[in-house]
Amino acid sequence: MSQQLQQIIDNAWENRAELSPKAAPAEVREAVAHAIEQLDKGALRVAEKIDGNWTVHQWLKKAVLLSFRLEDNAPMPAGGYSQFYDKVPSKFANYTAEDFAAGGFRVVPPAIARRGSFIAKNVVLMPSYTNIGAYVDEGTMVDTWATVGSCAQIGKNVHLSGGVGIGGVLEPLQANPVIIEDNCFIGARSEVVEGVIVEENSVISMGVYLGQSTKIYDRETGEISYGRIPAGSVVVAGNLPSKDGSHSLYCAVIVKKVDAKTRAKVGLNELLRGD
């Protein structure tokens, strides 16, 4: 079924300029709607780990983008305190008490998740925003004013602290989603964007900014890398001097690496304060 869906959506993408809410084949509408439904249920996801490597399913990103071409903006009631005007309804717009109980997660007002995002059991959504295509796995806390961008992949038992920004990547289409693996802690007001991968059991301190052009300096080895935080890293904000010493520029510094056992036993503050 997925291969057939993919073919229909790939073909529709090539002819997307001809599509509109009033002009789209029924086959395309049904395929896109089904893909969004499967993303919403977590049956499909934009990226998944296969044999130890992350694989991105670009056709599902195409399905999300096509859904914007196929839908008109429409008023959306917001419980009497406001109205919204958009193409994508709330994930929880038609939820009953039974639906919430079956989902097994908490949604604290006024948290918003768009339809097409997946929220797993034991997730807590504080007043936050989760965009279409995102996948938030079991036991994760999305704290107040945190944002989970389109198609971002958040692992199990992750803590996204207050005001954290996880970037979305619907465009450019070739871009990979941000991935936060299992058991990571992302400190308050930090930003992870542009397809950066934070591997499992890592701790990102408050106010760390990670994009593809951010230098990641490992102080134990002196190595500089980009785009990936290795498993078990403890990362703080820092600076590196220019070659001529006239100025310094922002970087992220890996101050130490810890295994999962140490990560579980040692408090976060102790990890971040250690020399």
UniProtKB/Swiss-Prot annotation:
PROSITE patterns in the cross-refs: HEXAPEP_TRANSFERASES (PS00101)
Name of the gene: dapD
MF-aspect GO terms: 2,3,4,5-tetrahydropyridine-2,6-dicarboxylate N-succinyltransferase activity; nucleotidyltransferase activity
Protein name, per record: 2,3,4,5-tetrahydropyridine-2,6-dicarboxylate N-succinyltransferase
One matching Pfam family: THDPS_N_2
SUPFAM superfamilies per the UniProt record, alphabetical: Trimeric LpxA-like enzymes (SSF51161)
Matches recorded under Gene3D superfamilies: Hexapeptide repeat proteins (2.160.10.10), Tetrahydrodipicolinate-N-succinyltransferase, N-terminal domain (1.10.166.10)
Enzyme class, spelled out: transferase
Keyword list, A-Z: Acyltransferase, Amino-acid biosynthesis, Cytoplasm, Diaminopimelate biosynthesis, Lysine biosynthesis, Repeat, Transferase
CDD domains associated with the record: LbH_THP_succinylT (cd03350)
Classification via InterPro entries: DapD_Trfase_Hexpep_rpt_fam (IPR005664), Hexapep (IPR001451), Hexapep_transf_CS (IPR018357), THP_succinylTrfase_dom1 (IPR023180), THP_succinylTrfase_N_sf (IPR037133), Trimer_LpxA-like_sf (IPR011004)
Primary localization class, coarse: cytoplasm
Subcellular location: Cytoplasm
